């Protein structure tokens, strides 16, 4: 069933930017994307992308790549379960309460606009990239800086990186009995990681000290309870950094040599992912799921969570001429350009563009934790045993984010939609990053026993 909407809000389709015609399969979309989504689901069509699975989808180009168009339909929230399998006209009338809530919030937004006496300014069409930001002013001197993080028991390497990310201290891959095993095995007992070390797992690994968590966030006016809970789950950044640095500094068995720069970056990403797994295990709803569903969700979104973690770190870093590593070290973009390959350099620059875009949107910590939760509970995941629980979590997070943005940013009427559009770019970036990692893997350039490659292979099987 299609639901009407308020035309004076002049909504734009979140998939292609065309004018919406009503509520279709979970949200407001245009007639074209409504029909495309319905045909794809009912006919069980499978598309392929001839490019890099990150094609631009707008009103003029929406028919060029059905694969990317369908992926964007799922990303912005169109619901597979809302399409009738019997091919009869009309959708499943199970989203009526959500539509009514959405209409009520839009009425509230209109009232705020009228009360404040300003005209609703619509942003760029959804699915159409905003104007490119001005070129960053890379005025910092070349090289790398390692600012001393506060409160670290074992700070990051203080010497310069001689070769794009390689510290002067002997950093090595953590022991097979270190946090890698300790954080994954308790949650996923069936997971087997092939070790490059001769010593087998004779006994369950002992986890290291847990990540520290900050004082509970008490919230404030206009902060939904879900966001308050998510803020309380956020780990202390200094504690996470200290743990990762400590793991990287553990001596490797039989490997006293200094690791290569790219290998070191992969190990940083491994340890960052372990901290993300620890966060997910503490999340409401996620900890209620069966282990199989937990693994399915993480296999679907691990790269997006890593990319979004990097993006938010750069927003906090606030320097256009350098990037901040999870260890607290700064790497000049000029160093990346000079020493990284063209593929990695392109990825970094594309990520920096998203950093500028989210900075312009004034992304705050409350929105960050809610978006991270939305990434974890993606609705396009198949073969879940408890799909209804995941769907409920997604709907509550969407509602919380919408409430928060309307309350705290009433002058930015479309901020909620713009934030969701940024998640589309996060996904595109993560897919490009996975392709890069797999390319390095095929060239035997990835370090052995790498968790990221195992996640890639688990997704493909």
Curated annotation (Swiss-Prot):
Residues bearing PTM N6-acetyllysine: 34, 38, 72
CDD domains assigned to the protein according to its UniProt record, in alphabetical order: NR_DBD_Lrh-1_like (cd07167), NR_LBD_SF-1 (cd07070)
Assigned keywords, A-Z: Acetylation, Activator, DNA-binding, Isopeptide bond, Lipid-binding, Metal-binding, Nucleus, Phosphoprotein, Receptor, Transcription, Transcription regulation, Ubl conjugation, Zinc, Zinc-finger
Cited InterPro entries: NHR-like_dom_sf (IPR035500), NR5-like (IPR016355), Nucl_hrmn_rcpt_lig-bd (IPR000536), Nuclear_hrmn_rcpt (IPR001723), Znf_hrmn_rcpt (IPR001628), Znf_NHR/GATA (IPR013088)
Region (Disordered): 119-150
Top-level division of the source organism's lineage: Eukaryota
Residue segments, region Important for dimerization: 230-461
Gene Ontology biological-process annotations: adrenal gland development; female gonad development; hormone metabolic process; hormone-mediated signaling pathway; Leydig cell differentiation; luteinization; maintenance of protein location in nucleus; male gonad development
Pfam families the record matches: Hormone_recep, zf-C4
Alphabetical list of Gene3D superfamilies matching this protein: Erythroid Transcription Factor GATA-1, subunit A, Retinoid X Receptor
DNA-binding region: 10-85
Modified residues (Phosphoserine): 203
Compartments, as annotated in UniProt: Nucleus
Major location (coarse): nucleus
A GO CC term assigned to this protein in UniProt: cytosol
Annotated a 1,2-diacyl-sn-glycero-3-phosphocholine binding sites: 341, 436, 440
Job description of the protein: Transcriptional activator. Seems to be essential for sexual differentiation and formation of the primary steroidogenic tissues. Binds to the Ad4 site found in the promoter region of steroidogenic P450 genes such as CYP11A, CYP11B and CYP21B. Also regulates the AMH/Muellerian inhibiting substance gene as well as the AHCH and STAR genes. 5'-YCAAGGYC-3' and 5'-RRAGGTCA-3' are the consensus sequences for the recognition by NR5A1. The SFPQ-NONO-NR5A1 complex binds to the CYP17 promoter and regulates basal and cAMP-dependent transcriptional activity.
Family of this protein: Belongs to the nuclear hormone receptor family. NR5 subfamily.
Subunit text: Binds DNA as a monomer. Part of a complex consisting of SFPQ, NONO and NR5A1. Interacts with NR0B2, NCOA2 and PPARGC1A. Interacts with DGKQ and CDK7. Binds to and activated by HIPK3.
UniProt-recorded name of the protein: Steroidogenic factor 1
Gene: NR5A1
